[in-house]
């Protein structure tokens, strides 16, 4: 019967485990070379007798193929260059064997990556657009010459680089597009709180219907003739000289009067409130100024020229519009793509949205609310646009012992007469198409071909590419108590000309149904607002900035100097005085 005998071990009185002295290894194993390794290394062989420095396989790498790719993969692992000597490489066992295919193949007209690269090589349209603004602080006025753009040339080089440059299997660790913050964080800013979107998405708060406090302004009736506009009967978008005010919260005289009479602690506008409620959908950076007074009241304000004064375009697209590249070698491409940058598209979308609301109303029929427009003065020469301000109070209290009330200034754009002959308040918004083949289009369909026949597909694509903007439209309409929302589809008359636009169609939407279609959770939005309000209520008296990180799904709250924002106002006033 076979017997089992334990092997002899070297005695070691100092350590537990295998011996580590000079006599630990047998004599026949003492001269074997050794290279360091880690447990996560992909070990393919015991030792490399010819090239222990890891500089082997140059010829294999030069040949390319699967072996060269495997060699690049192993560079992501290991503790040092020496460990690459033991990396595993798949050998081509069938290298000496080949089969000749003598069957005839039919050339396909549809190319693969090469055709995609050529398609991407089409040059972007050039030009630059601008818009004119006038009026007092917080006023927005688009005149007859607003949004006029200079025509530019074509830039094929940038399109070729854009179409050919694709992220591959080896570029997973390359840095993605870096965006700039909406405001530069100062060295004297003190971070108070940081909350990521994952935590914000778990918040919930049920809020009851609001209480109306007062209403101001006057509304024009919506012109029903625009319901019959189609792609074949498209109408030109006119540039109409009207004034519409977008005053920030702390400069609103009505809110000052309400804060002196009411016990509410929080004050803001509907644009700020809708942004906070839909914050988890945002991609670009934005900022909100928070001011806490000595009596404990909190005002949420916007910066002049900030994110609240302009609309974004394709913010949520998988490949959103990109800024023009810097450098002399990209100068031609930057000039060609200047009209399709995020900033240029944002200015164009704001111009379109304003003028569409001005154009689709009948100024002969006027509906006046309780009070006159609180921002209009006799010094203004241009007529007022159709706009009404409704001041409403929401109860955000979760406990009776801790009452939290929010006063919001909401806006409606026009009115219409329903079947019951009652006046119904509506909001008027627009979506714009710039170039279906340009970078940043987000796979949008050609509206002139598909809008009439496949409007559902067009709207679904816009919901995907502009999820944040459409969610804000729906929430703002709900906050204002609007019965319906009129949505216009507007496209450039020529993809390379930003000065002329065409109204291709319109549609009626119910704000609550639109919010449900886009999975907008209002209780989650109110939970976000209550969380931010609690942070401001618990903070000390002073000024704060709530900033969305430009490259992360995070918001941060900073304590800033008391004169923050006033420096920019002084610069604007000096420029107006010089003019």
Swiss-Prot record:
Main localization of the protein described in the UniProt heading: cytoplasm
Cellular component terms (Gene Ontology): cytosol; eukaryotic 43S preinitiation complex; eukaryotic 48S preinitiation complex; eukaryotic translation initiation factor 3 complex; eukaryotic translation initiation factor 3 complex, eIF3e; eukaryotic translation initiation factor 3 complex, eIF3m
Region entry Disordered, spans: 1-20, 51-72, 109-170
Biased composition (Gly residues): 120-167
Comp. bias intervals (Low complexity): 51-64
Superkingdom of origin organism: Eukaryota
Keyword terms: Cytoplasm, Initiation factor, Protein biosynthesis, RNA-binding
Function description: mRNA cap-binding component of the eukaryotic translation initiation factor 3 (eIF-3) complex, which is involved in protein synthesis of a specialized repertoire of mRNAs and, together with other initiation factors, stimulates binding of mRNA and methionyl-tRNAi to the 40S ribosome. The eIF-3 complex specifically targets and initiates translation of a subset of mRNAs involved in cell proliferation. In the eIF-3 complex, eif3d specifically recognizes and binds the 7-methylguanosine cap of a subset of mRNAs.
Family: Belongs to the eIF-3 subunit D family.
PANTHER family tied to this protein: EUKARYOTIC TRANSLATION INITIATION FACTOR 3 SUBUNIT 7, EUKARYOTIC TRANSLATION INITIATION FACTOR 3 SUBUNIT D
Name of the protein: Eukaryotic translation initiation factor 3 subunit D
Taxonomic source organism: Mycosarcoma maydis
